[in-house]
Swiss-Prot record:
Record's function text: Protein S19 forms a complex with S13 that binds strongly to the 16S ribosomal RNA.
Organism: Halothermothrix orenii (strain H 168 / OCM 544 / DSM 9562)
HAMAP family named in the record: Ribosomal_uS19 (MF_00531)
Lineage: Bacteria, Bacillati, Bacillota, Clostridia, Halanaerobiales
PROSITE patterns: RIBOSOMAL_S19 (PS00323)
Name the record gives this protein: Small ribosomal subunit protein uS19
Family, similarity comment: Belongs to the universal ribosomal protein uS19 family.
BP-aspect Gene Ontology terms: ribosomal small subunit assembly; translation
Length: 94
């Protein structure tokens, strides 16, 4: 279930202010954020945002296709290590 349309999309105010300052000055540098729940706005396109995944900040380059999605969708919090392998040792135990 999505967010109510009357409320509008959520974006962290500090993050949006940093993006606006960078757009005005023309500078491009990595912005660190812990706000995984912020919606990606069109003003963010072309910037690199380091999104926290619980351990480190994952750099995410924002493209036009990402607009409307959340920042946390592009920084996975879990690492999939694969399912159990069929090895000689595991089959010998049966």
């Amino acid at each position: 279930m999505g967010r109510s349309l009357k409320k509008g999309p959520y974006v962290d105010k500090k993050l949006l202010n940093k993006i606006k300052e960078m757009n005005e000055s023309g500078k491009k540098k990595v912005i660190k954020t812990w706000s995984r729940d912020s919606t990606i706005f069109p003003e963010m396109v072309g910037h690199t945002i380091a999104v926290h995944d619980g351990q480190k900040h994952v750099p995410v380059y924002i493209t036009e296709d990402m607009v409307g999605h959340k920042l946390g969708e592009f920084a996975p919090t879990r690492k999939f290590r694969g399912h159990g392998a069929h090895t000689e040792r595991s089959t010998a135990l049966k």
